[in-house]
């Protein structure tokens, strides 16, 4: 399986105030898009996204475990020391999934909050693993084995996604090994010619 990352540019910032006066910062917008070729040359069939978002909502969002990071790590696991937000909802709307995430009071969440307060326009980027199948037209169709690591990481440069999010990490694959997700490196075996040759 390959690591797959996608960026979305348009997110809104919301500030909600509780009755006690405590303010919470949220980001909201399109987190995932289906049935359309994206700038990375990939297309997520809606049925694949629908199935995976349903699983992700049940296992992560509803249990308060749907976390995202500030920036994009190189692997499919969420690093707790880099967590900046918690995804609180992810709902289908046409060929999109609209998400909402609460910015947390973690060190990375505080950085994200400061960036927003200082007027920085941030984007979101999904991260997951799955297989890709290329069509004759050169579109990479994401397979039905796709699994979200997070529906949204917060990223700094959504205006240049092709430079920042190449999407597939060359030379690495992720495999299940006894219930643990492990990195598998591509390996080439070279042999020297035998003396008889």
Model-flagged regions — what are they?
Residues 31-56:
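N-terminal "first-domain core" detector
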Residues 43-44, 48, 78, 88, ...:
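Short coil/turn linker and secondary-structure boundary residues
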Residues 43, 71, 156-159, 193:
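Selective for proline/serine-rich intrinsically disordered segments
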Residues 33-40, 74-78, 107-110:
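Short, surface-exposed beta-strand/loop "edge" segments at domain boundaries and coil↔beta transitions
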Residues 16-17, 47, 190:
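Intrinsically disordered/low-complexity terminal segments and short unstructured peptides
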Residues 59-64:
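Short, well-structured hydrophobic secondary-structure segments
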Residues 190-197:
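Conserved small/polar residues in nucleotide/adenosyl-binding loops
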Residues 3-7, 12-29, 65-69, 79, ...:
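Residue microenvironments linked to proteolytic maturation
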């Amino acid at each position: 399986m390959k690591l797959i990352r996608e960026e979305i540019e348009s997110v809104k910032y919301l500030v909600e105030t509780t009755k006690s006066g405590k303010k919470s910062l949220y980001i909201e917008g399109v987190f995932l898009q289906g049935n359309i070729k994206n700038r990375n040359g990939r297309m997520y069939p809606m049925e694949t996204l629908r199935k995976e978002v349903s699983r992700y909502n049940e296992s992560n969002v509803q249990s308060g475990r749907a976390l995202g990071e500030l920036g994009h790590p190189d692997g499919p696991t969420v690093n707790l020391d880099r967590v900046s937000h918690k995804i609180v909802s992810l709902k289908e709307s046409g060929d999109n999934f609209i998400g909402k995430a609460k910015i947390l009071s973690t060190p990375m969440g505080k950085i994200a909050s400061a960036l927003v307060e200082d007027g920085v326009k941030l984007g979101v980027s999904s991260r997951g693993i799955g297989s890709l199948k290329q069509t004759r037209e050169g579109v990479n169709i994401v397979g039905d084995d796709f699994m979200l690591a997070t529906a949204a990481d917060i990223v700094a440069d959504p205006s240049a996604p092709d430079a920042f999010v190449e999407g597939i990490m060359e030379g690495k694959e992720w495999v299940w090994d006894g219930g643990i997700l492990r990195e598998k490196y591509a390996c080439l075996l070279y042999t020297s010619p035998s003396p008889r040759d």
